[in-house]
Amino acid sequence: MVGQRIRIRLKAYDYRVLDTSTGEIVDTAKRTGAQVAGPIPLPTVKNKYCVLRSPHVDKKSREAFEIRTHKRLIDILEPTQQTVDALMRLDLPAGVDVEIKAFEK
């Protein structure tokens, strides 16, 4: 797989779960002999929601909620076949969204 690059993009609401997942991916890739660039922290997206507390009146009484989406980017340079096999067998925790793209140089 000479001249290829694998880009892995991870998203999660909990940064601790995200960091453990990125650590597992980086360790697996390094163990199989691939070069790793990252994990690169991408900007956190904050979605804010404002909801009325009362179902009928009291417009002034509101409750605010916020959900943060944390993201990380990992590039695997010069992956071997063992790297791809190990990444396919890797079991990541629930709550982590994984996007994998392969590029030719």
Curated annotation (Swiss-Prot):
InterPro entries attached to this UniProt entry: Ribosomal_uS10, Ribosomal_uS10_CS, Ribosomal_uS10_dom, Ribosomal_uS10_dom_sf
SUPFAM superfamilies listed in its UniProt record: Ribosomal protein S10 (SSF54999)
Record GO biological process: translation
Self-association and partners: Part of the 30S ribosomal subunit.
One CC-aspect GO term: ribonucleoprotein complex
Tree of life domain: Bacteria
Function per UniProt: Involved in the binding of tRNA to the ribosomes.
Classification via HAMAP family: Ribosomal_uS10 (MF_00508)
Name recorded for this polypeptide: Small ribosomal subunit protein uS10
PROSITE patterns: RIBOSOMAL_S10
One annotated GO molecular function: structural constituent of ribosome
Homology family: Belongs to the universal ribosomal protein uS10 family.
Record flagged with keyword Phosphoprotein: no
Signal sequence annotation: none
Keywords from the UniProt entry: Ribonucleoprotein, Ribosomal protein
